[in-house]
Amino acid sequence: MNKLSRRQLSIGAGAGLLLAPFVAMLKEGPTRAATTKTAKRLLVFCTMGTKPDSWKPTGISGESISAWSAMTQPLSAIKDSVVLVEGCPAGNPGDGHGSPEGLTGQGNGYYAVNNVQQLAISVDQFVADKLKKAGINRPLSSLVLGADTSGGVTMSYRAGKAVAPIASPSSAFSTAFGAVSSGGGGGTMTGGGTMTTPDAALKRRQSILDLVSSEINTVRGRVGSIEKAKLDAHLDSIRALESKLTASTGGGSTGGGSNPDAIKACAGLAKPSDAAGTHPAIANDLLHMDILVNALACDITRVGVIQFGTDQGLQVDLPNLQGDQHNGFIHSGAGENFKSLIAFEAWLATQYANLITSLKSKPDPDGGGGSLYDSTLVVWARDMGDAVNHDMKDMRFVLAGGAGGYLKQAAGGRYVNAGGGASNRHERVLLNVLEAMGVTDYTGFGDPGFSGKSPLPGIAAT
């Protein structure tokens, strides 16, 4: 493979986003080895709380998992990657609905330093700010996506207020990839999560790949056969995502947050009998996950969030499983021994595992021969610990990804129980996330009065 100088390699700004992993291979100079075990990318998977006794693995020996619960069984497919964490109360363990504490470390209440209020900021937004301050500027500092999120409280926060996720997949695609057709930044979002300048290429059913075909051909002609196959797979995934979006919108309209045809959006997902009226949340969130992975792969952002519903509800329409997660599966589930909740939690675990698999299929945007998985930390976080009883006495996380070698992982999966107690509050796991992303100054994050402000032991590899 021939190395090219930046002058010789004429790639426009927009094309450079799509081709980031392969342009990195061609630029002059060797890839710098990482000096510390840190991740470069963060992907947060946000859901409601769960039922703790149904979530916990059924076979545990020390930190080893020998048998998985029905809820977590799908995670066994990626067991070498995952670390399950529980036994961490929130700072305000009695908080329930509407508390911002899940990703911020601040519950309901007033937090101040020297009589100056410290407004809540979630771990994803704090990381995004720190990366920008460190000079790691990308078209989007973060990308927060999620369907069916307007009827309650979501988990990403900035300046004490919840960050509204982008609900429409086509708006999300325009936000992330609009720069390809414009050659510049990623567009401007309005407060409601829609684009002021939607991606014209998608609207015309024209692939963004066609707009940069000459640059694609330039790169294809310079990489070796192995890299060429990876390039084709990378571009095929973007084209497939475009096809799903144009099919789901019936022409690519980017307005609004609805998708009236969930079967077209995600074939085989919705019930054929009521496809015309089915709720699109699940189908849209699957598209959102595809968009996030591709945005990370193209180095359009370093921080992504997928939010499934809110603290008040998520409409589920899957084969043999329909209803509202909150009022139905959680609060009306005792009569069926929480069968529907267990089934939906297993479905969520499957999607989390699929994210890991998808990251492994993408080349690292920084080059070096690794995968996107190698440089990404994937965090499954929840708004509450015990959703049935509405409390935060025992928060739980799933951590996975190569994360630059930060995580202490095991062949059969690792289980960490912090043991409870105020000193082991869940904010410490959020500090692990910051540490994994190379952030060691926690000023301005979490509870300023927490005396044990350090990452939880046992998460990081030594």
Where do the language-model regions lie?
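Ligand-binding pockets and gating/stacking loops
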Residues: 1-462
